[in-house]
Amino acid sequence: MMEDNKQLALRIDGAVQSASQEVTNLRAELTATNRRLAELSGGGGPGPGPGAAASASAAGDSAATNMENPQLGAQVLLREEVSRLQEEVHLLRQMKEMLAKDLEESQGGKSSEVLSATELRVQLAQKEQELARAKEALQAMKADRKRLKGEKTDLVSQMQQLYATLESREEQLRDFIRNYEQHRKESEDAVKALAKEKDLLEREKWELRRQAKEATDHATALRSQLDLKDNRMKELEAELAMAKQSLATLTKDVPKRHSLAMPGETVLNGNQEWVVQADLPLTAAIRQSQQTLYHSHPPHPADRQAVRVSPCHSRQPSVISDASAAEGDRSSTPSDINSPRHRTHSLCNGDSPGPVQKNLHNPIVQSLEDLEDQKRKKKKEKMGFGSISRVFARGKQRKSLDPGLFDDSDSQCSPTRQSLSLSEGEEQMDRLQQVELVRTTPMSHWKAGTVQAWLEVVMAMPMYVKACTENVKSGKVLLSLSDEDLQLGLGVCSSLHRRKLRLAIEDYRDAEAGRSLSKAAELDHHWVAKAWLNDIGLSQYSQAFQNHLVDGRMLNSLMKRDLEKHLNVSKKFHQVSILLGIELLYQVNFSREALQERRARCETQNIDPVVWTNQRVLKWVRDIDLKEYADNLTNSGVHGAVLVLEPTFNAEAMATALGIPSGKHILRRHLAEEMSAVFHPANSTGIREAERFGTPPGRASSVTRAGKEENSSGLKYKAGRLPLGKIGRGFSSKDPDFHDDYGSLQNEDCGDDDPQSRLEQCRLEGYNSLEVTNV
């Protein structure tokens, strides 16, 4: 198409140039003709006759006719030249008339001067010749003009054809351009529609991904809740069975127990009772039921002869207040099958005697009546510290039972089976009383049964009870254990479990030195895994903390590598969130009551933001008209301690966490203003609150701030906490090793990399040096 247009334009240009050249030639010819006419008129010859005038007029007419050129400029020039020729012809005629008049006058007035006829004839002949030549010139000019007119007609027809062709080509070009523009618009509309459809599909894809993620999280949460409910039901069933058996035993033991339960102060070696601050929720309901039975049933002489009496009840009144029971109910959260209560029931219940019970019952043949006589004699002895020794000697007394009592083939109504049922009930009560002794007795005074009860119920580690039974016989031995002894003697392969035991032992050692147990001892692993992680917005790590039995003491010793290696916390921000949550607990001296009181006061007011939970931060975000972005903070790890104690977490970081697009400057500026109004004055307020409710930010706590070193076990304590500036650098992911130098324990696992070496190192070994008898 473009080539055709170019060729057409070249042809049109050539035709126009040829026409211009022909017009130029015509002008030259007309100029020559005019010059010849001027020469003829200037030569003095006779003027042109009528024929010449007619021919000139005809020539003028033909010239005027020939001037009909499409090019108006050429026509105008031709017309001017024709009119000029007509004027010249008219002048010639006038000159001819004047000459004729002069001739007549000269013939009439001057006869003497009259020329001869011969001369006149000669002049006339000359004039006729000149006129003939002028006629010939005019005829030639006519012929030339006719020829030019024909050529002009041909040229006009060619120009018309060219114009028609050019118009058709232009029409085709216009149609092509119109179609091209239409197709281009259609293509642009199609591209825009595709872009909109792509954006819609992208939004739908991300919406589906978000819904799938939410559905997965919801399903996981529902599954975990279902598992927790199932485990809770199992725990409740186990506690119910244990309570029924304990109540049945207590119903029969009430007369003798009532006679032995004497009010008064509990005295150990003449000193006041050593009280531990932690309440055990497991024994609250049992001790309350026991107290009710003591004061409601009168003694019966027949029961006094038929029921065995445990010496542990003589000097340990089981009185518990309603507040303690309520606190126990609050702190008993659902847990898995490895919870301390379920383990207590599984070890204390007599339906399936395990290796521990087999070790406790040696095949020594002795009648049940002799055992009763022995107990009646021991009742008459003086009650004092020796009675506590007899409490832990019950394991030796139970060894006198016949192993045949555990045979399932015996009749349920036989005397042997009844005696077995009584022994199981007393064993359960003995275990509960031993747990009670853990609360009221220094660790150095513990016996083997108390150590086992502490390890199983308080520390929630029944998997190590068998090795503890074989190797640890008293609390003094437990205080002298090193990390190597814990690993090889008790089979504690997990470094976090070893750390938990070491921190607890050191806490009890400090308590014996004159200080009370740390407030961190009140924070069990159930509260840490369920309540605390949910408060800081990281409930997705609850199962890992639950599996590793992370309690309050463990929290105060966690390091970044512990979070990464053992607890699967790989995100830097989540690590900093956990560490800042621990820093907040440290500031309130690990007091749940102080923390809950401060959170209750700021629930409806935007004050004291350092103690805000993740849910309280979500509520604040909704209150400042950003509720469409509030759900993005769920399970994000953003809580009050991060907003106040982390200097690098500014308004930009908060906007990024909320998912506010970077182009929405008004929303980001609004968020920055709200944050500056709430969180900037929070530092001074947090210091005042810390001074009011707990340990000031600069003071060390009693668990990991003692500045000690235990050379025998490799346990090291470092005084002071890591400065928050270093945590801030770690939050910005610029310092990969932040918080690595913070902690209180060495991070050593037994064979974490090599499974074979782990099996060899975790093999249980017995040590004769650890088998220390009760003193």
Curated annotation (Swiss-Prot):
Low complexity: compositionally biased ranges: 51-64
Comp. bias (Polar residues): 411-422
Which parts of the sequence are annotated with region: Interaction with PPL? 174-333
Gene3D superfamilies associated with the record = Transcription Factor, Ets-1
Q: Which domain of life is it from?
A: Eukaryota
Question: Which residues, renumbered to this chain, carry the PTM Phosphoserine?
Answer: S352, S367, S387
* Entry keyword Signal: no
Q: Which Pfam families match?
A: SAM_1, SAM_2
Please give the GO cellular component terms listed in this UniProt entry.
Answer: cornified envelope; cytoskeleton; cytosol; desmosome; nuclear speck; nucleoplasm
Subcellular location, record wording: Cytoplasm, Cytoskeleton
On subunit structure and binding partners, the annotation says:
Isoform 2, isoform 3 and isoform 4 interact with PPL N-terminus.
Any idea what job this protein has? Component of the cornified envelope of keratinocytes. May be involved in the interplay between adherens junctions and desmosomes. The function in the nucleus is not known.
Record-stated family: Belongs to the kazrin family.
Protein name as catalogued: Kazrin
Q: Which gene encodes it?
A: KAZN
